[in-house]
Amino acid sequence: MVETNARWALKHGVFDEHELEQALDVLTEYDIDDRDPAWWLRGEHAMSMQTVQVLFEGTDGDGPDLELAARVAHLVGGGDAGEDRLRRIAAMTRDDAHAAIDAFDVYYRELGEQMRTGYPNVRAADMDATAERYVHTNALTEILLPSLSRVQVLRTRNETLRRATQLSYAVHLFEAHHGRWPGSLDELSAEYGARMRTDPFTGRDFGYRLTEGGPTIYSLSENGLDDGGVHSFRWGDEITNETESDDHVFWPPQERR
């Protein structure tokens, strides 16, 4: 929301040259993301392990607590699918529980490394493929092992939003200093660094096109291809333009739909 409002303020000419510099300083100063990208996976991992432990802890036989198993099956969906899950969980042994635990351990370790690597080297499809390798280990993993690629996509979009907003301000400062728009991002001052001009989805420069109406700044989004800066409001989630572009335009700011 802050970055969106900042770009609309830029569009309406709210700032003079000095204020542009101050605003850009604030945007870059508070763009600090030094937390481990995978820190929150610990909770997901712990929940899965705890569920397995509770199901099999304290039972007299080799199988799970059937009353708790029924609750788990109900929580993840009722009807015929829930009954089928319950039958499969009820038939599990402690060896099956250990297999599920091993799958969770390996999955969350691999997923954490993928999240730390991030785009452009690890994309949503890669994370989905990792989940697919372990989700069918047994009935418990099918219930408790999630695909979390969507989290990484949204996290990367947020980072893209922050960088593109800073870049929009840097381009406007160039215009204020030189009386013209930069012909390419290479003309921007080195003091801005490479980070704000780098599209997280590609690891390369944001899309930048200059026309008589001014610059267009856009992300190449999930497919990593330059689709000409044709705006897709919902990125790749819902493409409604004729060119099937998933490019997301940040400058000029786009009206909300």
Describe these PLM feature segments.
Residues 1-257:
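Short acidic linear motifs
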